């Protein structure tokens, strides 16, 4: 197998939403046109569209690929015998739910077989909503994969990953994320003995940076910190399995060439990575706890103006300086639906029970907030400036109800006693105001 790349295969291009271009060999990118009659290197021109042709130019996403064999060169797909087990939506359940960390399998399992379905909003053939998975794997993929159902946001919690994409290579580790466009072929190699993390499959409009409003022209996730691959390709004619996810089902075909044979490309429908440690956190310097929307990294807009199909929000290390304020996240009943995970450390609203690799789900109007231990400490605390360190929690927040999967409601990781953390909330009511 011949592998071709630049001298530094893991160089990246910087920026968000750019019209990127990259070639692994000189002459791979045609000049002045997209689809020449005869490509100088004998490559096929293929357009990879992420939006309809007629959307506003500011919304359009497409990339031109120059590859050794066109993607169309494949035989018929066959439905696979092994599907994503337990992904059917379970019975309606308004309760607050929390899960312990999911185990790494004992037997060899790759990234795709290691998918654990937790929740979804609606059928994947609709142009909105999300599906949420955990992955737990201990073996690198030998096959290739793509999802026709949505864009993938991958959040590692344990173990480093190398993601081979049609556009090049992405290395990510815990505290970094990767985003793969709908339909992009990829393969995941484990750089450690095992890996675990979270996936949000976005069925709606592609993720983008949130508007900053009065914050101004800088802050939150800055565009220059997003990294996109440079061109990299394989030139071989060895058989390889290609799996696609289509309407929630897995289908397979076999290629006689590598699906990662793109020698050059240009466009803005791209894979990218981002280091969450570079997030410019905004918070109060006077009083009260601002709404968590100030921690939004990426957003996919929904049909209702101002209401997201999905917001990806993080709770990173930060200084707490608010005066005369209950500093943890306040008690809340939300129109939106909140799925939370923990990458590292502890979450400041929960003293115990919410561990790295675990998850929680608070659906529309499910009352939630700090547990009793956290609330008692916050009420009694001396309000000196202090820094919350060694933490990284995140939230997938969506305007649609997240229905837990059949697997999520029946697995041993589901905590039967989650509601108990709010039992015996200390009564502090006093008819006479405090002096």
From Swiss-Prot:
CC per GO annotation: cytoplasm
Binding of Fe cation, residues: 332, 338, 368
Keyword tags: Dioxygenase, Iron, Metal-binding, Oxidoreductase, Phenylalanine catabolism, Tyrosine catabolism
Residues binding homogentisate: 347, 368
Active-site residues (renumbered): 289
EC number(s) given by UniProt: 1.13.11.5
Protein origin, superkingdom: Bacteria
Pfam family, one: HgmA_N
Cofactor: Fe cation
One GO MF term: homogentisate 1,2-dioxygenase activity
GO BP annotations listed: L-phenylalanine catabolic process; tyrosine catabolic process
Catalytic reactions on record: homogentisate + O2 = 4-maleylacetoacetate + H(+)
Gene3D superfamilies with a match to the protein in the record: Jelly Rolls
Metabolic or biological pathway: Amino-acid degradation; L-phenylalanine degradation; acetoacetate and fumarate from L-phenylalanine: step 4/6
Subunit structure: Hexamer; dimer of trimers.
HAMAP family cross-referenced by the UniProt entry: Homogentis_dioxygen
Family (UniProt): Belongs to the homogentisate dioxygenase family.
The protein's role, per its UniProt record: Involved in the catabolism of homogentisate (2,5-dihydroxyphenylacetate or 2,5-OH-PhAc), a central intermediate in the degradation of phenylalanine and tyrosine. Catalyzes the oxidative ring cleavage of the aromatic ring of homogentisate to yield maleylacetoacetate.
Protein name: Homogentisate 1,2-dioxygenase
The species this protein was found in: Pseudomonas savastanoi pv. phaseolicola (strain 1448A / Race 6)
Recorded name of the encoding gene: hmgA
